[in-house]
Design a protein with these regions (language model features):
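Surface-exposed interaction regions that form or flank ligand-binding interfaces
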Residues: 1-79, 89-91, 100-105, 111-208
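Cell-envelope/extracellular polymer assembly enzymes that use nucleotide-activated donors
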Residues: 82
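Conserved hydrophobic "DFG−1" position in protein kinase catalytic cores
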Residues: 85-86
Length: 208
C-alpha cells in the first residue's frame, strides 16, 4: 500500500491552461522535463527492429523536436505526445514524468509527491486525464480496433515510488521500460500493419 502521508497543497501546484494541458512552467522546469524525455528516447533507441519509434520532428509553439498530432475530422485541438512506439502488440502511448524524490499513489488513484530535499507530501496531478486525451486522439487516427497500451514512465533515476498497483495505467521506471514493451503480451499485428500505422500517424503530424 502507499504510505500514509500528510497532504500539503502549495500555491501554483497543478496549474492548467484553458485547453486542459498543464500550464507552461518556467524554462528551467521545461528543460528538466526535456532531459527526462531524452533519457527515455535513448532507451527506446535500443528496441528490436520489430518496433517502430515515431520520430520527433514537429515544431511546436514553445519547443521543437516533438510529436504533435492533429485530426481535424475528430477535433481542432492538437495534442503533444512524449513518445509513441508501434510494435506487434499495438501502439505504446508513453507519457514521461521526470520526477525526483518520492511518489506515492493511494488506493483512490491520487498522486502524492515529496520533492527532493523537502519533507512534506504535496498533491500532484495524476497524468491519467492527459494520457486519456492522447489515447482518444490516437484512436481517431488509427481506428478503435488497434490495441493502444498506455504507459506512464518515470524517467529520473532517483525516483522512489510506492503504490504502483493502485494506478489503472501501468507506471514503469525508465530502466524497466524496454523490458515492459518487449515482453508485453502476445503479438497481434503484422510487420505490414506496423508500417501502415507508422505512415498513418506521420500523416497527422503538424507544426506550429
Amino acid at each position: 500500500d502507499a504510505p500514509s502521508v500528510t497532504v500539503s497543497l502549495k500555491n501554483n501546484e497543478n496549474r492548467t491552461a484553458a485547453n486542459g494541458e498543464p500550464a507552461r512552467r518556467t524554462p528551467d522546469i521545461n528543460n528538466w522535463g526535456k532531459a527526462g524525455e531524452d533519457a527515455v528516447d535513448y532507451v527506446l533507441k535500443w528496441l528490436p527492429d520489430v518496433f517502430s519509434v515515431i520520430e520527433k520532428d514537429c515544431v511546436g509553439k514553445y519547443s521543437d523536436n516533438i510529436i504533435l498530432l492533429e485530426n481535424p475530422a475528430f477535433s481542432d485541438e492538437a495534442q503533444e505526445f512524449d513518445h509513441l512506439v508501434i510494435g506487434p502488440q499495438g501502439i505504446f502511448n508513453i507519457e514521461t514524468k521526470n520526477y525526483a524524490g518520492k511518489l506515492a499513489i493511494d488506493k483512490a488513484g491520487n498522486w502524492l509527491r515529496m520533492k527532493k530535499g523537502e519533507t512534506e507530501w504535496c498533491a500532484e496531478e495524476n497524468p491519467a486525464q492527459q494520457v486519456f486525451r492522447h489515447r482518444v486522439l490516437l484512436q481517431s487516427i488509427v481506428g478503435y480496433q488497434i490495441p493502444i497500451i498506455d504507459v506512464i514512465c518515470l524517467s529520473h533515476p532517483s525516483i522512489m515510488v510506492a503504490g504502483q498497483e493502485n494506478s489503472k495505467i501501468p507506471v514503469v521506471k525508465k530502466d524497466l521500460l524496454a523490458d515492459f514493451i518487449v515482453n508485453y503480451r502476445s503479438a497481434s499485428l503484422t510487420a505490414e500493419q506496423v508500417a501502415m500505422l507508422e505512415r498513418r500517424i506521420n500523416s497527422c503530424k503538424i507544426s506550429k
